[in-house]
């Protein structure tokens, strides 16, 4: 008797996960809608390396950011790959692009505008939710030789 399970993603699951990522992007300025897409235990590591643990803490961090000039910083996400780790856990590899529309900010001294974003999503009774989002900056080589 085999105890292994298939980790081949179905078209329906992949579409649901892609929809989740798209909805997260669309909801980035709506804290309530964004939080509904995350598990209660979610962990977030942003482009700057700030770690936020738990949906309540994440909601406060997002509300604070949206009440500041950071509300003029939006991101877009392009999915590179979706794969199952287990039947109910998927790893989503993305490229995140930051669009900083704040005035008076010297973007040359800011963080890179592109990052490698990895989501870990989990399936629950309510569908797929984000359990972890981690973004690693993608550094652009400089010509300072």
PLM segments and residue spans:
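Short, cysteine-centered beta-strand-loop-beta hairpins and adjacent loop/turn segments enriched
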Residues: 98-110, 139
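Hydrophobic/aromatic beta-strand elements that line small-molecule binding cavities or substrate pockets
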Residues: 58, 62, 77-83, 96-98, ...
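Short, low-complexity N-terminal intrinsically disordered segments enriched in polar/charged residues
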Residues: 1-40, 142-145
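Generic short beta-strand segments
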Residues: 43, 93-101, 136
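A short, structured loop/turn motif at beta-sheet edges
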Residues: 82-91, 121-129
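Terminus-proximal functional modules
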Residues: 15-16, 20, 88-90, 95
């Amino acid at each position: 008797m085999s105890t292994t399970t298939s980790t081949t993603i179905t078209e329906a699951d992949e579409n649901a996960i892609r929809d989740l990522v798209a909805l997260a992007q669309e909801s980035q300025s709506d804290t309530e809608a964004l939080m509904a897409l995350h598990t209660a235990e979610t962990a977030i590591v942003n482009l700057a390396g700030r770690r936020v643990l738990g949906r309540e803490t994440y909601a406060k961090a997002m509300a604070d950011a949206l009440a500041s000039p950071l509300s003029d910083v939006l991101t877009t996400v392009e999915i590179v790959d979706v794969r199952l780790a287990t039947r109910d856990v998927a790893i989503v590899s993305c490229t995140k692009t930051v669009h900083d529309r704040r005035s008076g900010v010297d973007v040359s001294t800011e963080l890179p505008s592109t990052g490698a974003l990895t989501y870990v999503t989990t399936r629950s009774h309510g569908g797929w939710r984000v359990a972890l989002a981690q973004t690693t900056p993608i550094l652009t080589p400089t010509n300072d030789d």
